[in-house]
């Protein structure tokens, strides 16, 4: 690797942990249920996005349990998650409370109709 450190500086990098990447397929009923719940709560369809993070257990859930994981967020980029000025707006907090039960309802409906 190309070093950015001056020649007088020695840099040692020690990896501590890691995890495999995970992407939830958008043709999955869990994703479809989440999208339907977001649409009902916010009044517009959700836009799928990929965002980074380190939740190593998510890959293991699928590997070991053979089940997809749905990660549903309600924060904004301006919330500055994990920073000294981290915050989370009450509006999105309440929208999350409204959306999660709808997700379970939509998931159950889609799951039952897929079994037929």
Regions found by a protein language model. Give the residues of each.
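An extended, acidic, His-containing surface patch that forms the Zn2+-binding/catalytic region
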Residues: 4-115
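Phosphate/pyrophosphate-binding loop motifs in nucleotide- or prenyl diphosphate-using proteins
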Residues: 1
